[in-house]
């Protein structure tokens, strides 16, 4: 059985084949776990395809057990890109998959496959619903917060208000994907309710994600060994992840727990010491920096840098509290 995956990330093995190195230090690790599980089945051939700016033409790569098709990113996969359609037809004709699994509805290359090829053997899985979350993209910030933190990067790339508009546009082809789909995979009642509202005729399949093997080595969180009163955020580089809301709550937390600390996975979005950092500083990063200073939290916030699976696991084990605050998406926990 041939299964074609269409993903939003370049798998580490494919990156190694392209540029000689590769380690996943971003979201999407559950796909590696699921791929490893599928590869235990002898009757399954897995083909993984994505878009990347590391190639300029459609590239086929042979991994140890997985065949990869990497499409050139082109203009962007954040908006409708008709160039993907002919490439997907080429991939489909060469692979002739029995099943196509599109991981996520956030990007236009999955939408392009459904437009270019038959949807009869396609299942889409919900990772995040941009059509819903766009309304709350910078919830907790005012437009004045956006304008007074305008940066050079905002001039080139746009402010969070522009990003919200882009989310809304992406939400339109996301809804089109859901309307076309005959099968949808989700994890939460929110996934089910939102997709049913768009396409009540699609068959819904519940399926939790599989993590990478390192998360199943028997380690378990223990209060005795955690860093007391530490709060961990697994990502927070754009407003939807709610870092600004956690910072606003921190003065109240500090009244009761003066030694409380916030640790955030990922690069430091507030750094602006060098010219390069000043150029790359986003308006949201500037807003977070001002908020930290206003609330006198300079010694209470740490960015860890990008983490691999083992490093992420250690952060989960060390933290006293995990804050996975997110406004109106597939997850809402705090």
Predicted regions and their residues:
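Acidic donor-binding loop of glycosyltransferase active sites
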Residues: 182, 317-330
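Membrane-proximal helix-turn-helix segments that form the acceptor-binding/catalytic region
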Residues: 146-183, 193, 197
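N-terminal subdomain of nucleotide-sugar transferases
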Residues: 1-55, 64-66
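Short alpha-helical donor nucleotide-sugar binding micro-motif in glycosyltransferases
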Residues: 92, 314-319
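Conserved donor-binding/catalytic core segment of Leloir-type glycosyltransferases
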Residues: 4, 222-241, 247-254, 262-265
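Active-site proximal beta-strand in glycosyltransferases
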Residues: 2-6, 99, 116-156, 185, ...
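Acidic anion/phosphate-binding donor-loop and adjacent secondary structure
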Residues: 196, 210-228, 314
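Nucleotide-activated donor-binding/catalytic signature segment of Leloir-type glycosyltransferases, i.e.
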Residues: 205, 275-306, 310
């Amino acid at each position: 059985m041939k299964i074609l995956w269409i993903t939003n990330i370049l798998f580490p093995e494919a990156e190694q084949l392209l540029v000689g190195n590769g380690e996943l230090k971003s979201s999407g690790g559950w796909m590696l776990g699921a791929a490893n599980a599928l590869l235990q089945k002898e009757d399954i051939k897995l083909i993984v395809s994505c878009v990347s700016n590391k190639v300029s033409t459609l590239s086929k790569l042979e991994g140890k057990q997985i065949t990869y098709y990497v499409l050139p990113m082109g203009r962007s996969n954040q908006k409708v890109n008709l160039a993907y359609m002919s490439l997907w037809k080429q991939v489909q004709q060469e692979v002739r998959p029995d099943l196509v699994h599109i991981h996520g509805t956030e990007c236009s290359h999955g939408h392009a496959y459904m437009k270019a090829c038959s949807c009869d053997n396609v299942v889409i899985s919900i990772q995040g619903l941009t059509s819903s979350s766009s309304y709350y993209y910078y919830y907790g910030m005012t437009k004045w917060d956006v304008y007074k933190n305008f940066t050079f990067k905002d001039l080139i790339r746009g402010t969070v208000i522009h990003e919200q508009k882009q989310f809304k546009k992406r939400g339109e082809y996301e809804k089109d994907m859901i309307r076309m789909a005959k099968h949808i995979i989700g994890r939460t009642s929110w996934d089910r309710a939102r997709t049913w509202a768009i396409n009540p005729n699609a068959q819904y399949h519940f399926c939790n994600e599989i993590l990478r093997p390192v998360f199943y080595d028997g380690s378990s969180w223990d209060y005795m060994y955690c860093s007391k009163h530490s709060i961990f955020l697994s990502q927070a580089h754009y407003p939807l992840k709610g870092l600004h809301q956690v910072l606003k709550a921190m003065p109240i937390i500090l009244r009761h727990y003066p030694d409380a600390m916030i640790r955030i996975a990922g690069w430091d979005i507030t750094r602006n010491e060098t010219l390069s950092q000043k150029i790359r500083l986003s308006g949201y990063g500037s807003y977070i920096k001002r908020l930290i200073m206003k609330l006198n939290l300079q010694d209470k916030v740490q960015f860890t840098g990008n983490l691999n699976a083992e490093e992420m696991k250690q952060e989960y084990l060390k933290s006293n509290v995990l804050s996975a605050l997110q406004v109106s998406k597939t997850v809402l926990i705090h």
